[in-house]
């Protein structure tokens, strides 16, 4: 019995060592399996992708401003309202604009009459020149006869002197009338009535007054939704002052900020999978890299950091990457500027360019609402000219 009792501790020690070795082997095996699984997961699912959650929706916020000063009379749209290009958003009091327009019409009528009067003045001066030419010819004829009589001693010297003075006076009158005629002809320059400088100035003033009257109605430059309205009825607005913004849901993009270490294989044209926090992980959207900014976000900030100090700490910088979105995907799931998103870029194909290539000049955005049909004012101008000319 004593011998059996002395053998049990040794057996238990060997058994414990064996169990520990087995446990350690199992643990190491599990670590290897986890490591291999992670490596395989990285190779098949992560190697060809770069992902960031630092991504936000950007878009064009078209600021609506006034081109003329005035007081707000009407506001026709509020925040979140759908508007179309050309819709009247704000109306200014047009009393002063109408008065200026009426004054400009009167000024054009007066300018036409003055030019017409100038034409009659030229005709009168032409007649005066002709009359003075006749007077000079008569005076010269009288002087020639008196020269012959003076040689014969038939007239006195005083009559002869008067004849000479009459010729000089006729010459002076003729020169004066010619100068007056030339001065008035210089004002007309033998050009059509409408092209006269005085009338052109009056026409331009009338068009400007008409344009200012049209601009008292402030229109939406694009299709979109009203945002950031800060104008109030009765408010005095100045030229260029922001009244509200119009945001187009077709002019949006994603601004994704990637770490500089993630840009090594990132190229323009690479596909992007996007999840917006608004619609959750189950709703996936497509995008394409449209460009990579020429500087980090910190470099373009209002107060960029200064690293020329003794307490420098290296911080990984982030570079904005613009991702083009497909507007057709957002007809039923619209976006809002500033929404958060997660962007995952497939970088397996890195044959594209990192910088945009030079392209032919083109118009990216435009509006026709700032142009006005001038046919009405042109007809008005022609009517005023015809009514005040012979």
Swiss-Prot record:
PANTHER family: MEMBRANE FUSION SUBUNIT OF EMRAB-TOLC MULTIDRUG EFFLUX PUMP, MULTIDRUG EXPORT PROTEIN EMRA-RELATED. The keyword Coiled coil applies. Confers resistance to antibiotics. It is found in: Cell inner membrane. GO terms for cellular component: plasma membrane. Disulfide bonds: none annotated. Residues 1-25 are cytoplasmic. GO terms for molecular function: bile acid transmembrane transporter activity; xenobiotic transmembrane transporter activity. This is Multidrug export protein EmrA. It holds the Pfam family HlyD_D23. Belongs to the membrane fusion protein (MFP) (TC 8.A.1) family. Residues 160-190 form a coiled coil. GO terms for biological process: bile acid and bile salt transport; response to antibiotic; xenobiotic detoxification by transmembrane export across the plasma membrane. The keyword Membrane applies. It comes from the Bacteria. It comes from Haemophilus influenzae (strain ATCC 51907 / DSM 11121 / KW20 / Rd). Residues 47-390 are periplasmic. InterPro entries: CusB-like_dom_1 (IPR043602), CusB_D23 (IPR032317), MFP (IPR050739), MFP_proteobact (IPR005694). Keywords: Antibiotic resistance, Cell inner membrane, Cell membrane, Coiled coil, Membrane, Transmembrane, Transmembrane helix, Transport. It is a single-pass membrane protein.
């Amino acid at each position: 019995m004593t011998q059996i009792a002395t053998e049990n501790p040794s057996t238990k020690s060997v058994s414990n060592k064996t169990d520990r070795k087995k446990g350690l082997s199992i643990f190491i095996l599990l670590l290897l399996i986890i490591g291999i699984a992670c490596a395989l997961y990285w190779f098949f699912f992560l190697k060809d992708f770069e992902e960031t959650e630092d991504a936000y929706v950007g878009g064009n916020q078209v600021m609506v401003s006034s081109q003329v000063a005035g007081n707000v009379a009407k506001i026709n749209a509020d925040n979140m309202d759908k508007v179309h290009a050309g819709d009247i958003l704000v109306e200014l009091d047009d009393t002063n604009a109408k008065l200026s327009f009426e004054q400009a019409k009167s000024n054009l009528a007066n300018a036409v009459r003055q030019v017409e009067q100038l034409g009659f003045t030229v005709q009168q001066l032409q007649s005066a020149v002709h009359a003075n030419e006749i007077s000079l010819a008569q005076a010269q004829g009288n002087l020639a006869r008196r020269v012959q009589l003076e040689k014969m001693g038939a007239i006195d010297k005083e009559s002869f002197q008067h004849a000479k003075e009459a010729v000089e006076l006729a010459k002076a009158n003729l020169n004066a009338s010619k100068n007056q005629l030339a001065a008035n002809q210089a004002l007309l320059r033998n050009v059509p009535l409408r092209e006269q400088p005085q009338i052109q100035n009056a026409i331009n003033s009338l068009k400007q007054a008409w344009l200012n009257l049209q601009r008292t109605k402030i229109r939406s430059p694009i299709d979109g939704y009203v945002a950031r309205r800060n104008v109030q009825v009765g408010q005095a607005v100045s030229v260029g002052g922001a009244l509200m913004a119009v945001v187009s849901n077709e002019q949006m993009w994603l601004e994704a900020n990637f770490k500089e270490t993630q840009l090594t294989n990132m190229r323009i044209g690479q596909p992007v999978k996007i999840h917006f926090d608004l619609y959750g992980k189950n709703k996936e959207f497509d995008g394409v890299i449209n460009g990579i900014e020429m500087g980090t976000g910190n470099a373009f900030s209002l107060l960029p950091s200064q690293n020329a100090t003794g307490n420098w700490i290296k911080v990984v910088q982030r570079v904005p990457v613009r991702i083009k979105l497909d507007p057709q995907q957002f007809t039923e799931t619209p976006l809002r500027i500033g929404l958060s998103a997660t962007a995952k870029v497939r970088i397996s194909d890195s044959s594209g360019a990192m910088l945009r290539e030079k392209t032919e000049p083109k118009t990216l955005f435009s509006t026709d609402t700032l142009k006005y049909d001038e046919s009405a004012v042109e007809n008005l101008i022609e009517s005023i000219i015809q009514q005040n000319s012979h």
